[in-house]
Amino acid sequence: MKRILTSLCALFVCLNIIAQGWPAGYGGVMLQGFYWDSFDDSQWNVLEKKANDFSGYFDLVWVPQSGKAAATKSMGYDPLYYFNQNSSFGTEAELRSMISTFKNKQIGTIADVVINHHGTNNGWFGFPAEVYKGVTYQNLSTDVCADDDGGAAATEARKTGTQLSQNNDEGEGWGGMRD
């Protein structure tokens, strides 16, 4: 019985590995360069100093979202700005320097961005405008899913006379950000 269970477990693990959908022939290794509340350990200049240690072992370093967030200490999942790259992890110049150093060591960089999360700076629907290359971008209340936050957004919209999108959220509800 023990052999059967061990064999089934081994088969299950192998099937899960195959199901991951990795590109054929991919031999790279990615390092997650952050963890929850890793503001000090994941500073751009701290990661950059580790490039020699990473080189030869890791092909990619996965870094936190680099845009300016609503909170001073933020993992980036409450983004206010996508083009302002001064975040809890450092400045835009430090980010660019880290990426350049990684490139020189043949290490790629991949950012953890949850594009449907949007922080606000003035109530539930106060999204700031952002100008990039002469074009102004701004989320509106009509960009917020009709059933966002399990109906809490709709309740707030009714109280303030605000219109939401007619579309429902297709993912899991989460009360931390407007979707």
Question: What is the role of each PLM region?
Answer:
Residues K2-A10:
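Sec-dependent signal peptide recognition
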Residues R3, I17-G21:
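Bacterial Sec-dependent N-terminal signal peptides
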Residues G21-N52, G56-L60, P64-D179:
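Substrate-binding/active-site clefts of carbohydrate-active enzymes
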